[in-house]
Amino acid sequence: MGEKEMRLRRCCFTGHRPEKLGRPEAEVIKSLEREIRSAVADGFQTFISGMARGVDLWAAEIVLALRDEGASIRLICASPYQGFESNWSTAWQKRYAQVMEKADLVRYICPRYSRDCFQRRNEWMVDHSARVIAIYNGELGGTRNTLMYAERNQVPVVHA
């Protein structure tokens, strides 16, 4: 199967870190699970997580849980650079490590931190996906930039 055909079966996530959600965490996780299950029902087989705290990691954990339940799905972890999580709390670092360990593929988008590494990661995810599942609060920032990039590139966005 070529890259174009594989892209048609890939879905990525964009969303906020926990402190910027503006919605209860449990509600966000429930919405993510609903949209991921819907994407699986629509034929999506591979999910790409940008591995940030909050939406990205919760979505990755949901994908892994569904895979453990028997769904034939894969997880790609698209981390912006190695060591990205090093300044997080121990609890978030542990979650990050567990997801990375269980992923089907880990991809470091940049060799090291750079000012644009997060945007490059987000664009890479959109460029390799046919759908974006988003948790968006309307504020300026990386999530908005990712949604605008998806729109410019005609990649459909589902708001969870």
Give residue ranges: language-model regions.
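Acidic/glycine-enriched connector segments
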Residues: 2-160
